[in-house]
């Protein structure tokens, strides 16, 4: 029961705007720039520690831009089928917004096949779709995706 209450509390008080986000000033300033210009590159947010605000930062940025947003928790959904079905369908769909943003939380849980498939999709849909990846274990991410 305590775990459910902690989850509820964390979601209730999760920052929703860049002004509410407290933590890394460098990230906050970069995000403010992205929001002002409505520009975004693919991002990899990582820190060895859990609970440092990676997911909150990703959601704040994505929801502050003119974008359709898809969120996937890769610790639950991490197969190549997720990439080929859900992600490709979303990335290839039409949108009236400037961007489509796909947040892949806990990306290091993606299988190697899923990471390889995603890498080619990041290139294929780079004109309209941006990927924000969060992870704790940067060493599990292939160099091709890090670059």
Q: What are the roles of these predicted feature ranges?
A:
Residues 1-147:
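P-loop/Walker A NTP-binding region and its immediately flanking N-terminal helices
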